[in-house]
Amino acid sequence: MAQNVKILSTGRYVPDRVLTNYDLEKMVDTSDEWITQRTGIKERRIVDGTTSTTDLAVRAAKNAMDKAGILPDDIDLVIVATVTPEMFFPSTACLVQKELKLKNAFAFDISAACSGFIYAMAIATHFIQNGFCKNALVIGAEALSRITNWSDRSTCVLFGDGAGAAILSSSDEQGILGFELGSDGENGLLLYCHAFGLSDVTYSQVKENPNFRKIYMEGNEVYKFAVKIMPYAVEKVLEKVGLSSSDIDVFIPHQANIRIIESAAKRLKIPMEKVFVNLHKYGNTSAASIPIALDEAVEEGRIKKGDKVVLVGFGGGLTWASTVIKWV
């Protein structure tokens, strides 16, 4: 019989530096009004020159571990979802393991962009259900400012840096009810970032055009994908666990764009008062978006024991993912 799994605790960390829309007005041809109306974003957090993705991940993880009162020796799995590792190897997860002295854990990264945290949750859940481990540290961490083209006004207004974490543990009660995961590689080049040195991108190309290795996005196409796939992913996972959208107490979508969030909520007939939104403060933090929002929702008392919570994300790949959680 499969072991039940619950979220034991959550944590987050964002850098101190705030980059406002008014700051961006001085960098590119844009305005606070233009950004706010089209995205809902007012500001975002940006790392300084010495802070790495690992640093962000470690702080979020430590926050989650402190809340749970769990010892380093009790963590036996670490998964980091990121598209901005500072090294190809060792993995960010192994670097986190080193910093937090998680000597009994095995550790690895996954790359699923903004869907990555839920992908990582699904992997950790199945490891725990099958008795392979008991306590998994799952982290979404990004330093997107390092791969943002700060001269492209259509994308530089969107992204921010940060990390969120959750500890998943075996439980007598069933907390995590189910998942829906998917991908569409056929349309992967609607949103991408080159890995210089490992593909057809040469050093000379990057030297001539530093923005060659930055985020590229066909915004209109990604928007059309997002407004369809988020409701689809939620409907599929609810169907799997025998629930309907009216059963949802708290809806936490990937924090990419307020118009996408409002469209998804409307299609699902979920009132906005059940939707948790914090993108006005942080922008799109990719894999960190959902765990940061989840931790804030818990901290603010938006999630109570017994609540049914839906998380859903979409991102580069193209990918999508959703999960239903009963808060126990």
UniProtKB/Swiss-Prot annotation:
<comment type="function">
    <text>Catalyzes the condensation reaction of fatty acid synthesis by the addition to an acyl acceptor of two carbons from malonyl-ACP. Catalyzes the first condensation reaction which initiates fatty acid synthesis and may therefore play a role in governing the total rate of fatty acid production. Possesses both acetoacetyl-ACP synthase and acetyl transacylase activities. Its substrate specificity determines the biosynthesis of branched-chain and/or straight-chain of fatty acids.</text>
</comment>
<dbReference type="InterPro" id="IPR016039">
    <property type="entry name" value="Thiolase-like"/>
</dbReference>
<protein>
    <recommendedName>
        <fullName>Beta-ketoacyl-[acyl-carrier-protein] synthase III</fullName>
        <ecNumber>2.3.1.180</ecNumber>
    </recommendedName>
</protein>
<keyword id="KW-0808">Transferase</keyword>
<dbReference type="GO" id="GO:0006633">
    <property type="term" value="P:fatty acid biosynthetic process"/>
</dbReference>
<dbReference type="InterPro" id="IPR013747">
    <property type="entry name" value="ACP_syn_III_C"/>
</dbReference>
<feature type="active site">
    <location>
        <position position="254"/>
    </location>
</feature>
<dbReference type="GO" id="GO:0004315">
    <property type="term" value="F:3-oxoacyl-[acyl-carrier-protein] synthase activity"/>
</dbReference>
<keyword id="KW-0963">Cytoplasm</keyword>
<dbReference type="Pfam" id="PF08545">
    <property type="entry name" value="ACP_syn_III"/>
</dbReference>
<keyword id="KW-0444">Lipid biosynthesis</keyword>
<comment type="pathway">
    <text>Lipid metabolism; fatty acid biosynthesis.</text>
</comment>
<keyword id="KW-0511">Multifunctional enzyme</keyword>
<feature type="region of interest" description="ACP-binding">
    <location>
        <begin position="255"/>
        <end position="259"/>
    </location>
</feature>
<dbReference type="Pfam" id="PF08541">
    <property type="entry name" value="ACP_syn_III_C"/>
</dbReference>
<keyword id="KW-0276">Fatty acid metabolism</keyword>
<dbReference type="InterPro" id="IPR013751">
    <property type="entry name" value="ACP_syn_III_N"/>
</dbReference>
<comment type="similarity">
    <text>Belongs to the thiolase-like superfamily. FabH family.</text>
</comment>
<feature type="active site">
    <location>
        <position position="114"/>
    </location>
</feature>
<dbReference type="InterPro" id="IPR004655">
    <property type="entry name" value="FabH"/>
</dbReference>
<dbReference type="GO" id="GO:0005737">
    <property type="term" value="C:cytoplasm"/>
</dbReference>
<keyword id="KW-0012">Acyltransferase</keyword>
<feature type="active site">
    <location>
        <position position="284"/>
    </location>
</feature>
<comment type="subunit">
    <text>Homodimer.</text>
</comment>
<keyword id="KW-0275">Fatty acid biosynthesis</keyword>
<keyword id="KW-0443">Lipid metabolism</keyword>
<dbReference type="GO" id="GO:0033818">
    <property type="term" value="F:beta-ketoacyl-acyl-carrier-protein synthase III activity"/>
</dbReference>
